[in-house]
From Swiss-Prot:
Biased composition (Low complexity): 14-34, 179-241, 251-288, 303-316, 365-390, 397-491, 686-722
Protein name: Homeobox protein 4
Segments forming a coiled coil: 254-287, 472-500
Keyword DNA-binding belongs to the record: yes
Swiss-Prot/TrEMBL keywords: Coiled coil, Developmental protein, DNA-binding, Homeobox, Nucleus, Transcription, Transcription regulation
Cited PANTHER family: HOMEOBOX PROTEIN SIX, SIX HOMEOBOX 4
GO cellular component: nucleus; transcription regulator complex
UniProt-listed InterPro entries: HD, Homeodomain-like_sf
Molecular-function GO terms, alphabetical: DNA-binding transcription factor activity, RNA polymerase II-specific; RNA polymerase II cis-regulatory region sequence-specific DNA binding; transcription cis-regulatory region binding
Stretches for region Disordered: 1-41, 179-491, 686-740
Subcellular location: Nucleus
Listed Basic residues bias regions: 317-328
Pfam family, one: Homeodomain
Length: 740
């Protein structure tokens, strides 16, 4: 059975003025002080400790404007590094067509001789027009937040750890057109989330600007204005409320705290007559969690002609027990509203004449309760119309609710709230100058009278009797609130850390779009890079737990759009690779000449048979007859023969290798050139074998050859054959392909 002392403690719980209100979110930043690796991250970001860093060097090994490929060779062959901004502009200039697929159809079947002809096959560019979701407000209210996120990302990319000349642009810059009208309202330019120097910071939401503004208050001022959460959600997201896994979940504790704040403010303003129902509802919710208060619709006139209240619950089987002869009924909510001036009931008063107001709050059963009643319950046949209504609990257990209403409306003295130590089964006597019932007031029996002696000084002893219990309950409630706030802060910090990791990975993926076209100098340690990013985040935004819900949602949307741009850029590079590797090679009648370096142009030649034409053979034979003394063409001579014959350098080299082996000795005999054991004439060749033999050939003006040999003829023949193999320029795989 609930006693009056418990009721008084609940009332004094609500009467404490802002001293027991949501006792401080003091642990917003304390949870982040002991994070592992913070000292390491501070060292990594320190400019004096550059040796600990793992620098990222981004190379762009292909010129997107010319669409030339880069071989995966040494970094010395890489072209001059372009700014990232220029590279991205080049990427966007060669982006996707309207149908989201590359148009790789050739305009003609002519030979591809340079990159200008390859550009005829390029895909058509389209502008980047990303549209923000409908639930995101892109007015001037979010301009400061957009600039703040962009500034932090630019600072991170311009750090010494990255060798980037220009940062990766934010996709939201495209949507800031005509959004710079109200930047000076309430000095929001200086109130961005930039300065977080105290452990205790108020996250006050400005409804006029719909933006979080940090207020650098004193560390002792820890009142958290959390009463506008629902209003914030309705203002920012009028269409739908997104469920974000990276955002903190606001549980029912905030809603309960808001109710407590409202009650405290009403007590301070002495609006006791307007808050009777609120106090009643709070007490009823504490006793019966299945009941909650709601306002009936307009025009709903709820009468009590059947002498039953609108409290819907299961009728109790317990019977009313009374030890006194004078029978009294507990006052209903509607009766108390009509009798605001006098809060006690006459013994023979008939409740049949009472009617509730149309807009009076009623207590209905919870939707979770299967026994919900949409209409007031009808009295049982055995129940008298003059009998009090039946509650889910016995009348003795619920009579204290009426006392709470009486106590909350006595503004004369706060200490009188602790004097109601009896049930409403007895008479309520308001004796202003009664000194005879002091002994009865000192007892806590349920059968004594309630004597509200407002001007009686002897009642102060009784008033002080329950103060210790009240303070104990208040401290316990404060401890519970602190524990709930700490748990909420830990959840928010964990979600925000996941959001920071998502942002970091999005930036890295946006920089290194495709590993085939972008290279990293040395080996980048992503763990150390994340510590640097996290420390920069703390320096710029403050504690991880204080970024706010709207900022967290914006960062997540920022990462989503950045990832979309990364995927589109990756598709662009894949389209280029597929274009070169598949499309050009299947052109009928032409074959692609692969590029050996980044500066070489892409060429294609007509496909020909294995045997050379007669005209090409005559040109090559005439050249070797004229140079029979030294049949080794230089690179310039090979290019000249290439232009005359229309052959490739590989074909010319293979022809000279085969001719020197098979026809040069015969041509030398026909020309009257004397050779030693069919040794091929050369200008000067020094051969060293294992025996230490030296063979020196010198070409004189009279085409005579002077030979000095220290080895036998077999060694000379072996050395000469070895020399022939070294002169084929590494292209002897087709040596027998062009035999006559």
């Amino acid at each position: 059975m609930n006693t009056v002392e418990e009721n008084n403690t609940k009332i004094t719980d609500n009467n404490n003025n802002n001293n027991n209100n949501n006792n401080n979110n003091n642990n917003n930043n304390n949870n982040n002080k002991n994070n592992d690796g913070e000292n390491l991250s501070q060292q990594l970001i320190d400019s004096n400790n550059k040796k600990l860093r793992s620098p990222i060097q981004v190379y762009f090994d292909s010129d997107v404007s010319s669409c030339s490929l880069q071989s995966q060779s040494s970094p010395q062959q890489l072209p001059t590094q372009q700014p990232i901004q220029q590279q991205i502009n080049n990427i966007f200039n060669h982006f996707l067509p309207q149908n989201q697929a590359p148009l790789l159809q050739a305009q003609n079947q002519q030979p591809i001789n340079n990159i200008n002809q390859v550009s005829n096959f390029q895909i058509q560019p389209i502008p980047l027009t990303f549209q923000l979701p409908n639930n995101i407000n892109t007015n001037t209210n979010n301009t400061n937040m957009i600039n703040n996120v962009q500034q932090f990302q630019n600072n991170f990319l311009n750090n010494n750890d990255f060798s980037l000349t220009d940062p990766v642009p934010s996709p939201f810059v495209l949507f800031n057109n005509n959004n710079n009208n109200n930047n000076n309202n309430n000095n929001n330019n200086n109130n961005n989330i930039n300065n977080f120097h105290h452990n205790n910071i108020n996250n006050n939401f400005d409804n006029n600007n719909s933006n979080y503004n940090t207020i650098n208050t004193h560390p002792n001022n820890t009142n958290n204005n959390s009463s506008n959460i629902n209003q914030i959600q309705s203002n920012i997201y009028p269409q739908q409320n997104l469920h974000n896994p990276f955002l903190p979940i606001h549980n029912n504790n905030n809603i309960n705290n808001n109710n407590i704040n409202k009650n405290n403010n009403n007590y301070n303003n002495n609006n006791n007559n307007k808050n009777n129902n609120n106090n009643n509802n709070n007490n009823n919710n504490n006793n019966n969690p299945q009941l909650f208060s709601m306002e009936p619709p307009n025009g709903f006139n709820h009468s009590t002609t059947d002498n039953t209240s609108s409290v819907s619950s299961v009728p109790s089987n317990k019977k009313k027990s009374s030890k006194t002869k004078q029978k009294s009924k507990p006052l209903t909510i509607q009766q108390q509203q009509q009798h605001k001036s006098n809060y006690h009931q006459q013994p023979n008063q008939n409740s049949q004449h009472l009617q509730s107001k149309p807009n009076s709050p009623i207590l209905i059963s919870s939707p979770l309760n299967s026994q919900q009643n949409s209409s007031p319950p009808q009295p049982s046949p055995t129940q008298s119309f003059l009998s009090p209504p039946q509650y889910s609990q016995s009348p003795q257990n619920n009579n204290f609710n009426n006392n709470n209403n009486n106590i909350s409306n006595n503004n004369n003295n706060n200490n009188n709230n602790n004097n109601n130590n009896n049930n409403n089964n007895n008479n309520n006597n308001n004796n202003n100058n009664n000194n005879n019932n002091n002994n009865n007031n000192n007892n806590n029996n349920n059968n004594n009278n309630n004597n509200n002696n407002i001007n009686n000084s002897t009642n102060n002893n009784n008033n002080n009797s329950n103060t210790n219990n009240n303070t104990n309950t208040n401290t316990n409630n404060n401890n519970n609130k602190n524990n709930n706030n700490n748990n909420n802060n830990e959840i928010e910090n964990n979600n925000n850390e996941e959001l920071i990791l998502l942002w970091y990975n999005s930036i890295i993926k946006n920089i290194i779009v495709d590993e085939n076209h972008f290279k990293i100098e040395n080996q980048f340690n992503k763990e150390n890079g994340y510590l640097v990013f996290k420390q920069l985040f703390k320096n710029h935004f403050g504690s991880i737990g204080t970024i706010g819900k709207e900022m967290a949602e914006y960062i997540q949307l920022h990462c989503e759009v950045m990832n979309e741009i990364t995927e589109l850029s990756k598709f662009h590079f894949q389209s280029i690779d597929n274009f070169y590797n598949n499309y050009i090679r299947i052109i009928n009648g032409y074959s692609l000449i692969p590029a050996k370096d980044s500066g070489a142009t892409i060429k294609a030649r007509p496909k020909k048979g294995a045997k050379l034409s007669k005209e090409s053979k005559d040109i090559l034979e005439n050249w070797i007859k004229n140079h029979i003394a030294h049949p080794y063409p230089t690179n310039d001579e090979k290019e000249q023969l290439q232009r005359q014959t229309g052959l490739t350098p590989n074909q010319i080299s293979n022809w000279f290798i085969n001719t020197r082996r098979r026809k040069v000795p015969t041509l030398c005999d026909e020309a009257g050139i004397i050779t030693n054991s069919n040794v091929m004439p050369q200008m000067t060749i020094n051969n060293n074998n294992n025996n230490g033999g030296n063979s020196n050939f010198k070409n004189n003006n009279n085409n005579t050859i002077t030979t000095t040999s220290t080895s036998n003829n077999n060694n000379n023949n072996n050395n000469n054959n070895h020399n022939e193999m070294e002169c084929d320029d590494g292209e002897n795989e087709e040596s027998s392909e062009y035999d006559d």
